[in-house]
């Protein structure tokens, strides 16, 4: 159920957090019940498309890098058994980072092939995996990181096509490979997530510097990958006839505008509380919340500090925009009876 992928909440629905006792990705019964209900709708749609029935689904991954998160084997067993009950017959896999033996082994499970996620150092990392899984199982890189994602305020990540092709060659000498990513994508709307430890969220584009760009353009990385793969298997030439069109839309003239504070009563309903409410408290999964407070009974406030914001914060003082931040925000010389909004 958890996919990471820099997708909002790793693909888990926000409403799970309305349970103040919620424990994710473990044997917490309300979480397992939600997973089972979700799978009961999703899996029957996938079962007919498994490769043993003429379809394209060749493997099913139980979790995603679970060894980094926990070691609840009973939870992984629940996923495995539930999927089997619902008709999954193709092999199961797990995926973790080979560079950490404890974390890799925490994600392993009987009845599932352990695979590794990596972007370089195939000889050493596959060597580590061989120690963990023994001599009789195939080696596979489930996520070959041939690029990387971008966060707001950072430089765009790119990787050398030549170096990426060399890493691919080293992987194919030793085992099997699944590209992450083969084609770049887009996390529209509020669906882009945030990497653990990062101060800013990820951008809408998930181009990833992949072999095929976000809009399907062929890159030098694609051409070099094709040459490497041709060393290990026959590649049939396919004419690439689809024209990928790009267009410059030029300037757009804005003929009218309004501001948030003049239309608040038309787009939302106020909720009053003596303390800040979370999005889960008011049943809002996505979008924005406007928090407002008045500073009272103090002649002068030298500084107000906002701490612990879990996401992007835009702050206004008396209706005027002040600051955007992802961390602590400070204000100086705010006087009594003035309104602070964020």
Q: What residue spans do the PLM features occupy?
A:
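Active-site mouth of glycoside hydrolases
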Residues: 1-89
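The substrate-binding groove and active-site-proximal loops of carbohydrate-active enzymes
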Residues: 19-35, 62-71, 117-118, 147-161, ...
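Substrate-binding cleft/loops of secretory-pathway carbohydrate-active enzymes
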Residues: 68-82, 88, 97-129, 189-193
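Catalytic-core region of carbohydrate-active enzymes that cleave or remodel glycosidic bonds
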Residues: 121-211
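Extended carbohydrate-recognition surfaces in non-catalytic/accessory domains of CAZymes
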Residues: 194, 206, 217-220, 227-302
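Aromatic-lined ligand-binding clefts that engage carbohydrates, nucleic acids, or primary amines
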Residues: 301-317
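A cross-kingdom feature marking solvent-exposed beta-strand/loop segments within repeated
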Residues: 316, 321-331
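Conserved small/polar residues in nucleotide/adenosyl-binding loops
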Residues: 332-339
């Amino acid at each position: 159920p958890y996919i990471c992928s820099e997708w909002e909440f790793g693909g888990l629905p926000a409403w799970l957090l309305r349970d103040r006792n919620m424990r994710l990705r473990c044997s917490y019964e309300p979480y397992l019940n939600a997973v089972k209900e979700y799978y009961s709708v999703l899996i029957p749609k996938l079962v007919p498309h498994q490769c043993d029935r003429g379809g394209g689904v060749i493997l099913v991954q139980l979790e995603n890098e679970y060894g980094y998160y926990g070691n609840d084997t009973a939870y992984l067993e629940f996923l495995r058994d539930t999927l089997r009950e619902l008709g999954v017959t193709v092999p199961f896999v797990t995926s973790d980072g080979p560079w950490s033996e404890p974390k890799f082994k925490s994600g392993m499970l009987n009845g599932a092939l352990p695979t590794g996620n990596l972007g370089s150092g195939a000889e050493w990392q596959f060597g580590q995996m061989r120690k963990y899984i023994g001599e009789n199982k195939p080696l596979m890189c489930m996520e070959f990181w041939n690029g990387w994602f971008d966060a707001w305020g950072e430089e765009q990540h790119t990787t050398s096509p030549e170096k990426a092709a060399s890493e691919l060659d080293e992987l194919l000498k030793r085992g099997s490979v699944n590209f992450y990513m083969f084609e770049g994508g887009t996390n529209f709307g509020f669906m882009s997530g945030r990497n653990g430890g990062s101060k800013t969220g990820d951008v809408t584009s998930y181009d990833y510097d992949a072999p095929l760009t976000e809009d399907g353009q062929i890159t030098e990385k694609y051409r070099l990958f094709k040459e490497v793969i041709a060393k290990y298997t026959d590649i049939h030439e396919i004419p690439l006839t689809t024209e990928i069109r790009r267009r410059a839309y030029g300037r757009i003239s804005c003929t009218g505008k309004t501001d948030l504070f003049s239309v608040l009563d038309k787009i939302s309903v106020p909720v009053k509380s003596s303390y800040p409410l979370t999005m889960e408290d008011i049943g809002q999964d996505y979008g924005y919340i406007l928090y407002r407070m008045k500073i009272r009974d103090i002649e002068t406030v030298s500084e107000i500090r906002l701490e612990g914001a879990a996401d992007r914060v835009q702050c206004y003082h008396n209706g005027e925009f002040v600051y955007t931040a992802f961390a602590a925000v400070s204000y100086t010389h705010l006087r009594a009876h003035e309104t602070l909004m964020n």
